[in-house]
C-alpha cells in the first residue's frame, strides 16, 4: 500500500510540476491556509526546513518543495478520493422478486474533495426487463369530454392486453377532475350548482376539483365497470383544474396505490389548458399549495376551495420525488402548450389525442415505449456550492459532453455517465446528494465532504521546546506563538520590540504586507515573480509597467516600481528608441521635412504625407508654392498679426528666420504675389529636419494707380456721353417734326371744298308749333257760334 501511495504522489508531482508562483505568493502561515491557496499547493512539515524568511516558504508545489530539500514523507498534499460503500451489480434479465432489481451502480459512496480539484466517478444505469408498471388514468370530465368518456369504456381490457406484451406485472387506476367549485370558475345560482348543464338542458354532476375513483388494480374489468359509471360535469372558463389533480395523484401514494418497485405512469387526458400558480386569486384563494395529500374519506380533494393551484415548480418537485412519469394526452389545440410544460418536467411526454380519444391506446403504448427507450439522470439534494458536470456514454459508444441523457436505448442496454464533481472552498459540514434515473426508484447516494485538513495537524506539541523555551506550540513544522511572543521560533517578546519599526509610516501595514517583522526588522517574503527588497519590503523588481507583455519593454530594468532604461531607449516603460536612422529619408532629410521623428518612427505632419519617412505626399505640391500662405501673411502682417502668421507657417511645417543661411544648401524660390510683385525667398532644412524660410524679398512691383485722375476721367467720360446722347435725341425729334409739317402742307394744298350746307350746321332760330293750341281755338269758335 505504501508503494502505491508513493507512486501516486510522484504522478501528482509530474502533473503539477508546471504550476508556479501561486502557492509561495499566498503567504500561508499554516498547512490549512496553504491548502486553501490553490488546488496544487502542498505544505512541508519538515522541521528546520525554512530560514528566517518565515513559514510562507513551506507552501509551494510538491515539485518545488522537493527541489528545496523537503523530504517526501513530510509533504502534505491531500487529494480528492472516492470511497465506495455499496456497489451491487446491475440486474440482468427478468427478476422474480422486484425488490432484488438493481438498475443503477454504484448505490452508495463517500466523496472527499480537495477544493479546486475535480473528481470524476462513473455511474451505470440499465433498465431491467419485465419491470412492473403502475398506470393511473387521470381524465378531464368537463362537458366537452362526453364523447371521449364513451370511447374509453372498454379501454381497461384493451390496455391490459397490450401491456401484457411488455410486462407481466401491470396495474391501472382511474381518477377524474373538472375545476375548483367556486366562482368565477363555475356558476353559483342554486340551479347551476346542482346541475351545471341545466342551460343545455342536460343533466351532469356538480362541479368538483378531483376525485380518486379507482386505486391501482390488476382487474381490467373493474376499470371498465368504473369508467361506465362516470358522468360528465361542467364549468365556465376554458382552463381546467388539472394540475390540482396531478399534484394529488402524485403525493397520495398510499391511496393511489403506487408501488415502490414499479414504473409509475400518470396519463393526463384533457382538451383544455390547466390553471396553475396564482390563477386561483381570481376566486379569492391566496393560500399557497402545500404539496400534501388532501383526499377525504370519499377520496375527493378536500382543499380545492382553500389552496391555490400548484406551480410548475411544485409539480416538478413532487413528480420527481415520487418517481411519477407524466404522459400528456391532449387535443391538437393544446399540444403546443403542453409541450412547453413537458420541457420543464423531467420524463414528461406529450401525445396528440383525437377528438373522441379514439387513439388513446396507441398513444399510451407509444409513450411507454418512448420512456423505456430513454435514460436520463437527475440530481437531488444540496447542490449549492458544488460544480457538477455530466458526460454521457450511450450504447453506441459515443461520448456526449455536458449531457446526462441517452436516447434510443433498448431495455437491457447499459448507459454510462461520467459525473465530475468539485468544490470551490472548504466547508466543515458534509452534504448528501442523490443521483437517480428519471422515473426509477433506484438511487446513488453520495456523501460529499471537503478535504481541507493535513495529517500533521493531528499531532501538536504545546509549549514545545522547539519554540524558544516553550513560548509556543509546534505543529506541522512551525511554531504557533503564545500571546506576547513573536518570531519564527517565538524568540521575540512583543513588549520588547514594537512592530512600528517595521512600518514605513503610521497607518501602513507592517513590512508593506509583503514580509514578516522579525524582532523589529523586516524579512521580505519570497516571490516567484522576482525579488522583494527595501527596509520595509516596499520595493520589488517586477511591478513596473509592461510593453507587449515584457517588463520595461525588455529594454530596461525595474527598480522599486520604476523602469531604468538602457542606453538608446527612453519612455515610461522604455519602449521608445532614441535612434533616428530609421526616420532619415534617402536625401538625408529627417522625415522628408514633412513630419517628426517619435520613438524611431516618423509621425507625418503634412496632410497627405505617408510612408516610413513621409516620402509620399501627392497633395504636398512643389516646396515653393506650398509656402505661399506663410510668405504672403509674413509680408502683409503688422506687429499684431505675427502670431497668426506663425501658426500658418507651423501648419505647413516651416518657420521664418531673419538670419542668413548658406545658399549652397538652400532652395531658391520665386512666386507671383497678389500685388503682382515677384517674391523671392530661400528654403533650407536645419539639423532636426525642420524647414526654414529666409531671405524673403519683393521686387518688380508695379506703381500704384492715380486714383483721383482715374475718377476725374471716368466722370468726364460719363458727362460727355450724356451730352452726345442728348444731341442725338434732339436731332431725331427735329427731323421727325419737319417731316410731319411737310406732309400736312402737301395734303392741304390738294384739298377742293364744295359750296353747300354743312350737314352738321344748325341755325340759331327754331320754330315750334303747339298742336294742342289749335284744338283749343276751334273749341272757342264753336262756343261762340252756339251763343
Curated annotation (Swiss-Prot):
Full protein name: Integrin beta-6
Q: Which residues lie on this side of the membrane: Extracellular?
A: 22-708
Keyword Cytoplasm among UniProt keywords: no
Q: How does it assemble?
A: Heterodimer of an alpha and a beta subunit. Interacts with FLNB. Interacts with HAX1. ITGAV:ITGB6 interacts with FBN1. ITGAV:ITGB6 interacts with TGFB1.
Signal peptide start and end residues: 1-21
Primary role: Integrin alpha-V:beta-6 (ITGAV:ITGB6) is a receptor for fibronectin and cytotactin. It recognizes the sequence R-G-D in its ligands. ITGAV:ITGB6 acts as a receptor for fibrillin-1 (FBN1) and mediates R-G-D-dependent cell adhesion to FBN1. Integrin alpha-V:beta-6 (ITGAV:ITGB6) mediates R-G-D-dependent release of transforming growth factor beta-1 (TGF-beta-1) from regulatory Latency-associated peptide (LAP), thereby playing a key role in TGF-beta-1 activation.
InterPro entries reported for this sequence = EGF_extracell, I-EGF_1, Integrin_beta_N, Integrin_bsu, Integrin_bsu_cyt_dom, Integrin_bsu_tail, Integrin_bsu_tail_dom_sf, Integrin_bsu_VWA
Question: What biological process terms from GO does the record include?
Answer: bone development; bronchiole development; cell adhesion mediated by integrin; cell morphogenesis; cell-matrix adhesion; cellular response to ionizing radiation; enamel mineralization; gene expression
Membrane-traversing stretches: 709-729
Q: How does it sit in the membrane?
A: Single-pass type I membrane protein
Q: Which residues form the PSI domain?
A: 22-71
Chain residues that bind Ca(2+) 2: 179, 235, 237, 239-240
Q: Which organism is it from?
A: Mus musculus (Mouse)
Annotated residues that bind Mg(2+) are located at 140, 142, 144, 240
Q: Where is this region: Interaction with HAX1?
A: 730-757
- Residue pairs linked by disulfide bridges in the UniProt entry: 23-41, 31-454, 34-59, 44-70, 197-204, 252-293, 394-406, 426-452, 456-476, 467-479, 481-490, 492-519, 502-517, 511-522, 524-537, 539-560, 544-558, 552-563, 565-574, 576-599, 583-597, 591-602, 604-614, 617-620, 624-669, 630-649, 633-645, 677-701
Please state which protein family the record places this protein in.
Belongs to the integrin beta chain family.
Q: Which residues form the VWFA domain?
A: 131-371
* Entry remark concerning the domains of this protein: The VWFA domain (or beta I domain) contains three cation-binding sites: the ligand-associated metal ion-binding site (LIMBS or SyMBS), the metal ion-dependent adhesion site (MIDAS), and the adjacent MIDAS site (ADMIDAS). This domain is also part of the ligand-binding site.
Q: Fetch the Pfam families from UniProt.
A: EGF_2, EGF_integrin, I-EGF_1, Integrin_b_cyt, Integrin_B_tail, Integrin_beta, PSI_integrin
Molecular function via GO: integrin binding; metal ion binding; molecular function activator activity
Amino acid at each position: 500500500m505504501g508503494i502505491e501511495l508513493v507512486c501516486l504522489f510522484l504522478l501528482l508531482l509530474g502533473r503539477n510540476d508546471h504550476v508556479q508562483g501561486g502557492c509561495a505568493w499566498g503567504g500561508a502561515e499554516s498547512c490549512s491556509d496553504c491548502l486553501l491557496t490553490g488546488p496544487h499547493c502542498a505544505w512541508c512539515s519538515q522541521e528546520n526546513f525554512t530560514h528566517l524568511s518565515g513559514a510562507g516558504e513551506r507552501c509551494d508545489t510538491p515539485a518545488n518543495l522537493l527541489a528545496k530539500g523537503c523530504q517526501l514523507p513530510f509533504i502534505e498534499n491531500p487529494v480528492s478520493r472516492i470511497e465506495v460503500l455499496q456497489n451491487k451489480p446491475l440486474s440482468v434479465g427478468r427478476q422474480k422478486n422486484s425488490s432484488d432489481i438493481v438498475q443503477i451502480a454504484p448505490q452508495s459512496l463517500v466523496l472527499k474533495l480537495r477544493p479546486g480539484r475535480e473528481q470524476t466517478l462513473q455511474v451505470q444505469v440499465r433498465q431491467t426487463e419485465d419491470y412492473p408498471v403502475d398506470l393511473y388514468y387521470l381524465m378531464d370530465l368537463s362537458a366537452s369530454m362526453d364523447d371521449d368518456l364513451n370511447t374509453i369504456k372498454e379501454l381497461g381490457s384493451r390496455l391490459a392486453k397490450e401491456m401484457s406484451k411488455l410486462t407481466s406485472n401491470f396495474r391501472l387506476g382511474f381518477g377524474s377532475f373538472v375545476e375548483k367549485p367556486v366562482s368565477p370558475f363555475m356558476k353559483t345560482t342554486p340551479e347551476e350548482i346542482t346541475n351545471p348543464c341545466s342551460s343545455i338542458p342536460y343533466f351532469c354532476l356538480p362541479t368538483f376539483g378531483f376525485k380518486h375513483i379507482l386505486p391501482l388494480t390488476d382487474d381490467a374489468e373493474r376499470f371498465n365497470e368504473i369508467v361506465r359509471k362516470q358522468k360528465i360535469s361542467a364549468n365556465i372558463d376554458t382552463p381546467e383544474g388539472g394540475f390540482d389533480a396531478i399534484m394529488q395523484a402524485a403525493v397520495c401514494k398510499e391511496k393511489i396505490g403506487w408501488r415502490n418497485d414499479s414504473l409509475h405512469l400518470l396519463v393526463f387526458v384533457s382538451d383544455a389548458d390547466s390553471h396553475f400558480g396564482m390563477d386561483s386569486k381570481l376566486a379569492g384563494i391566496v393560500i399557497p399549495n402545500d404539496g400534501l395529500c388532501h383526499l377525504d374519506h370519499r377520496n375527493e380533494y378536500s382543499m380545492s376551495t382553500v389552496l391555490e393551484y400548484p406551480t410548475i415548480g411544485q409539480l416538478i418537485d413532487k413528480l420527481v420525488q415520487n418517481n411519477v412519469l407524466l404522459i400528456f394526452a391532449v387535443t391538437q389545440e393544446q399540444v403546443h402548450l403542453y409541450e412547453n410544460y413537458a420541457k420543464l418536467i423531467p420524463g414528461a411526454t406529450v401525445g396528440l389525442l383525437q377528438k373522441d380519444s379514439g387513439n388513446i391506446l396507441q398513444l399510451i403504448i407509444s409513450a411507454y415505449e418512448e420512456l423505456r427507450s430513454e435514460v436520463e439522470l437527475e440530481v437531488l439534494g444540496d447542490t449549492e456550492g458544488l460544480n457538477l458536470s455530466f458526460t454521457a456514454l450511450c450504447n453506441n459508444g459515443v461520448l456526449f459532453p455536458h449531457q446526462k441523457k441517452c436516447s434510443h436505448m433498448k431495455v437491457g442496454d447499459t448507459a454510462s455517465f461520467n459525473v465530475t464533481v468539485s468544490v470551490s472552498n472548504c466547508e466543515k459540514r458534509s452534504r448528501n446528494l442523490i443521483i437517480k434515473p428519471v422515473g426509477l426508484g433506484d438511487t446513488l447516494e453520495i456523501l460529499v465532504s471537503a478535504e481541507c485538513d493535513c495529517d500533521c495537524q493531528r499531532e501538536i506539541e504545546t509549549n514545545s521546546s522547539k519554540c524558544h523555551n516553550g513560548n509556543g506550540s509546534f505543529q506541522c513544522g512551525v511554531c504557533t506563538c503564545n500571546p506576547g511572543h513573536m518570531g519564527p521560533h517565538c524568540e521575540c517578546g512583543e513588549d520588547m520590540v514594537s512592530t512600528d519599526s517595521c512600518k514605513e509610516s503610521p497607518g501602513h501595514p507592517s513590512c508593506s504586507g509583503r514580509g514578516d517583522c522579525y524582532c523589529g526588522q523586516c524579512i521580505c517574503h519570497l516571490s516567484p515573480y522576482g525579488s522583494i527588497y527595501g527596509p520595509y519590503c516596499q520595493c520589488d523588481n517586477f511591478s513596473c509597467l509592461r510593453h507587449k507583455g515584457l517588463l520595461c519593454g525588455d529594454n530596461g530594468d525595474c527598480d522599486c516600481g520604476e523602469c531604468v532604461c538602457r542606453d538608446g531607449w527612453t519612455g515610461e516603460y522604455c519602449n521608445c528608441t532614441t535612434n533616428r536612422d530609421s526616420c532619415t529619408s534617402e536625401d538625408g532629410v529627417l522625415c522628408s521635412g514633412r513630419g517628426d521623428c517619435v520613438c524611431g518612427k516618423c509621425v507625418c505632419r503634412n496632410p497627405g504625407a505617408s510612408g516610413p519617412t513621409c516620402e509620399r505626399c501627392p497633395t504636398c505640391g512643389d516646396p515653393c508654392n506650398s509656402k505661399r500662405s506663410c510668405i504672403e501673411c509674413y509680408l502683409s502682417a503688422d506687429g499684431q498679426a505675427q502670431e497668426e502668421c506663425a501658426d500658418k507657417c507651423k501648419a505647413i511645417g516651416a518657420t521664418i528666420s531673419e538670419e542668413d543661411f548658406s545658399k549652397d544648401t538652400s532652395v531658391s524660390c520665386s512666386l507671383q504675389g497678389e500685388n503682382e510683385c515677384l517674391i523671392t525667398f530661400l528654403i533650407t532644412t536645419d539639423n532636426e529636419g525642420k524647414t526654414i524660410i529666409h531671405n524673403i524679398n519683393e521686387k518688380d512691383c508695379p506703381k500704384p494707380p492715380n486714383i483721383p485722375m482715374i475718377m476725374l476721367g471716368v466722370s468726364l467720360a460719363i458727362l460727355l456721353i450724356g451730352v452726345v446722347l442728348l444731341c442725338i435725341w434732339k436731332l431725331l425729334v427735329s427731323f421727325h417734326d419737319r417731316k410731319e409739317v411737310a406732309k400736312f402742307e402737301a395734303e392741304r394744298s390738294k384739298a377742293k371744298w364744295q359750296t353747300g350746307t354743312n350737314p352738321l350746321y344748325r341755325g340759331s332760330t327754331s320754330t315750334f308749333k303747339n298742336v294742342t293750341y289749335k284744338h283749343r281755338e276751334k273749341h272757342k269758335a264753336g262756343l261762340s257760334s252756339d251763343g
